[in-house]
Amino acid sequence: GILAEIIGVNTGLIFGSYEYGQTLGFQIMNVPLVMGIIWVVTSLICGTIASQIKVRTPIQIFIAVSLMLILDVLIEPIAPKIDMWSFDHSSGGAPLSNYITWALVALPLQTYFIVNRLGFNIIISLNLYASQLLFFAVLSFL
């Protein structure tokens, strides 16, 4: 996750042309350090939720990646408003390629978490996921 962010923000090749604001704090190579934590925590809670669904492992992985994408779709329009990050202004927001490559980066992370059964507490995972959904949903209406 963090490696993809470092490459992406410095080249514009992975997620599109974007930059981070100051809201997320200390940066290493133009990427807030907290982004590494965000990738791990989001992967862990989405993988935990998906792994509780009694379907085959590939379907659990697909669900986990989808849960991550739902959050990303919700966060992207709000991120520039609160100076988290912003895409090139000429693009009018996050390009479709951002979501595609986001899923491609999330895929090996979710595969690793789910195949190795690295789940977290399901109640905490559900609460963290729901609180993020609620937080960014409310912000989208302000």
Language-model regions, residue ranges each:
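Aromatic-rich, lipid-facing transmembrane alpha helices and their immediate juxtamembrane interface loops
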Residues: 1-142
